[in-house]
UniProtKB/Swiss-Prot annotation:
This is Large ribosomal subunit protein eL8. Its main location: cytoplasm. SUPFAM superfamilies: L30e-like. It comes from Pyrococcus furiosus (strain ATCC 43587 / DSM 3638 / JCM 8422 / Vc1). It is found in: Cytoplasm.
Amino acid sequence: MAKPSYVKFEVPKELAEKALQAVEIARDTGKIRKGTNETTKAVERGQAKLVIIAEDVDPEEIVAHLPPLCEEKEIPYIYVPSKKELGAAAGIEVAAASVAIIEPGKARDLVEEIAMKVKELMK
């Protein structure tokens, strides 16, 4: 299946899994924002350290604005394959189209590692 138009680069499976792990750790030891509205606000306010966007969002318009907004605000973002997995990592029982890590907590090193790898992928 073709990737949605908002997916601007391919994320290796192990890096996507690290992103989900970072969400879980930040959820427990830091602060996250769940859902596209909360994520968008966190990006606009410059609070987000890392934005995680699901690749299986339908309709695409729900999250299509996030990659360009993150680029404008110079906030790293990454894709994960499943909104269901992203919701579970965020600690909610429903799917999440996107999540923003505001305070990484104990995931600080992991978030920094992901951000550096994402910069490489975006070249």
